[in-house]
């Protein structure tokens, strides 16, 4: 190594849309640098969880330290920091990028640029990173490198004349990627302070070590035995061990400035080491933390209830364990009259919710009922207090409410020109307001402000279907905005079912109420008595449908004769039904709770 220890370090991450070959390229880079032997190089090395593999999402083991001997004869220390690709995890992406000096922008040469990579690339450029375009999948017959280069220049606006064309699958030209990293990505720069500053890129829970934090040391050094201060929580922890991933975990004597590695300090849960926070020495702290830290706020909420009430303690334990690994997951106990005991959970987005639900069902063998996801609303009461409401059933009485505000997001949609009309129609249906339409080569960027409540249910699926799968979407939260919202309750035989309450725009309330009643009528099984299904706003009923009773033919044994005999039997049956209706309870199947989701899918 040269006299300046940071001169030969290169910290970089890979930005790519889902399925553009990010994990495969990472595998090839690890293989070329000899991180793993050939027999160990089976599948995507960096995706360790089975759900990650299936869905192609990256959560853990997010950094690899490699040694590379370049063509100029020098040894370089490469730190690859992997980033999640999905919009739900955009905060994690921004933290991963903050730890780097450069990024590889991987674009599938057969498909061109997609919205996710555009958003992440803008984040990288804003943070001053050197972006190196890589065109992947050039072995495919449909690959068109010139078109992909032109798209990078028009859509993202960075120079792609020196883009490296590779095939990660076959390993063709991957060596050139390593040379580009060494030559074009700058080395880490020393900071203006001598005191220790380290950025937490990610944290996860290990059963033996407690919390393992992946950190980028900006200035100073970390050695075992140091007492570290977590700047946002104000707590101190003693360092047990430090090291790097190669991608196996390897222990080192210390981590110095410019390096990326892991730190364990017997922290008991991931909330003790939040992503994006700054570590410094307790004895000699840095004057201020690194910029950009924010608490991760859940955006989508849903109720999770065990089908069997006896599973409630198991569900609590499973959620506690998941939370050790997932700082964005929030939950609190909830009691529903219809479903019994369960939890109200907060997620980053729909994908995050699906992953959590899938992990609970797979890893912990739980059978769950999920209520319709809702977003968080702000309610301004008449006395001037502002409350955040994540559960429609907890909405204050109408006479106490001054205004209700819903979350608005800014969405950027990239679509081929043929489908612009369909995309605009879809956004207008979802109460969107158009910001801009920009024609970029053979892609169109449509920017809309949309209510988040309309996006969380089925917007993504509908967008894919109206554009035959070609459009891609990226969004971020903007603000809360006031609007005429009401809560539509569902009453079954006069009893309110809290899990079926939804908050809707007043103009859509009647239609939603009518559709909900019709849908429930098909799903609730017939009973021995009439079941009345009503949709109501406050005390005003806006729609009703009835599940007719099953009835026995009590007149079957009567032959001709006097009508009064028949009347007596019918009256007796009617009395019995009336009594049953008073004491009878209607079992509501799981499909009925999901009906709330499917109303818009007609």
UniProtKB/Swiss-Prot annotation:
GTP binds at residues 19-24, 136-139. Keywords: Cell inner membrane, Cell membrane, GTP-binding, Hydrolase, Membrane, Nucleotide-binding, Protein biosynthesis. GO terms for cellular component: plasma membrane. It is a peripheral membrane protein. It is found in: Cell inner membrane. This is Elongation factor 4. Residues 7-189 form the tr-type G domain. GO terms for biological process: positive regulation of translation. Belongs to the TRAFAC class translation factor GTPase superfamily. Classic translation factor GTPase family. LepA subfamily. It catalyses: GTP + H2O = GDP + phosphate + H(+). InterPro entries: EF-4, EFG_III/V, EFG_V-like, EFTu-like_2, G_TR_CS, LepA_C_sf, LepA_CTD, LepA_IV.
């Amino acid at each position: 190594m040269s006299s300046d220890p940071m001169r030969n370090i290169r910290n970089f991450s890979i930005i790519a849309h889902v399925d553009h070959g990010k994990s495969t390229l990472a595998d090839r880079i690890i293989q070329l640098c000899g991180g793993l032997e050939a027999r160990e190089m089976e599948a995507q090395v960096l995706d360790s969880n089975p759900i990650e593999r299936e869905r192609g999402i990256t959560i853990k083991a997010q950094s690899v330290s490699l040694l590379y001997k370049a063509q100029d004869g020098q040894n370089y220390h490469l730190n690859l920091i992997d980033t999640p690709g999905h919009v739900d995890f955009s905060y994690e992406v921004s933290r991963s990028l903050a730890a780097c000096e450069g990024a590889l922008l991987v674009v599938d040469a057969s498909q061109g640029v997609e919205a996710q990579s555009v958003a992440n690339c803008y984040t990288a450029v804003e943070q001053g990173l050197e972006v190196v375009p890589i065109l992947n999948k050039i072995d495919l017959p449909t690959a068109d490198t010139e078109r992909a280069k032109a798209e990078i220049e028009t859509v993202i606006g960075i120079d792609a004349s020196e883009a490296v064309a590779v095939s990660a699958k076959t390993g063709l030209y991957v060596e050139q990627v390593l040379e580009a990293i060494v030559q074009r990505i700058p080395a880490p720069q020393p900071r203006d302070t001598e005191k220790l500053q380290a950025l937490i890129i990610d944290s996860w829970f290990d059963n033996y070590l407690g919390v393992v934090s992946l950190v980028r040391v900006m200035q100073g050094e970390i050695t075992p035995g140091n007492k570290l201060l977590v700047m946002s929580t104000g707590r101190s922890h003693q360092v047990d061990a430090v090291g790097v991933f190669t991608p196996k975990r390897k222990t080192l004597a210390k981590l110095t400035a410019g390096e990326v590695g892991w730190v364990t300090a017997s922290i008991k849960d991931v909330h003790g080491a939040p992503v994006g926070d700054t570590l410094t020495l307790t004895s000699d702290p840095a004057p201020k933390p690194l910029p950009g830290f924010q608490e991760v706020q859940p955006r989508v909420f849903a109720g999770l209830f065990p089908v069997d009430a006896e599973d409630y303690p198991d569900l609590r334990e499973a959620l506690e364990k998941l939370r050790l690994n997932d700082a964005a997951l929030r939950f609190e106990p909830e009691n529903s009259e219809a479903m019994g005991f369960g939890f109200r959970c907060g997620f980053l987005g729909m994908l995050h919710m699906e992953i959590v639900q899938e992990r609970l069902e797979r890893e912990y063998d739980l059978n769950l009922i999920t209520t319709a996801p809702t977003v968080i609303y702000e309610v301004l009461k008449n006395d001037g207090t502002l409350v955040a409401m994540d559960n429609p059933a907890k909405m204050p009485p109408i006479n106490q409410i001054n205004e209700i505000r819903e979350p608005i997001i800014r969405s950027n949609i990239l679509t081929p020109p043929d489908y612009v009309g369909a995309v605009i129609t879809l956004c207008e249906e979802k109460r969107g307001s158009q910001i801009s339409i920009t024609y970029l080569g053979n892609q169109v960027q449509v920017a809309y402000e949309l209510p988040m409540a309309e996006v969380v249910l089925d917007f993504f699926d509908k967008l894919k279907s109206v554009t035959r799968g070609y459009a891609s979407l990226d969004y971020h939260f903007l603000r809360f905005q006031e609007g005429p919202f009401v809560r539509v309750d569902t009453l079954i035989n006069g009893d309110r079912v809290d899990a079926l309450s939804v908050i809707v725009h007043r103009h859509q309330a009647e239609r939603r109420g009518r559709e909900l009643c019709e849908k429930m009528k098909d799903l609730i099984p017939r009973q021995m008595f009439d079941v009345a299904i009503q949709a109501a706003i406050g005390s005003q009923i806006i729609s009703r449908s009835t599940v007719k009773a099953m009835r026995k033919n009590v007149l079957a044994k009567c032959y001709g004769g006097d009508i009064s005999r028949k009347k007596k039997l019918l009256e007796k049956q009617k009395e019995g039904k009336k009594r049953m209706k008073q004491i009878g309870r209607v079992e509501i199947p799981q499909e009925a709770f999901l009906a709330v989701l499917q109303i818009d899918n007609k």
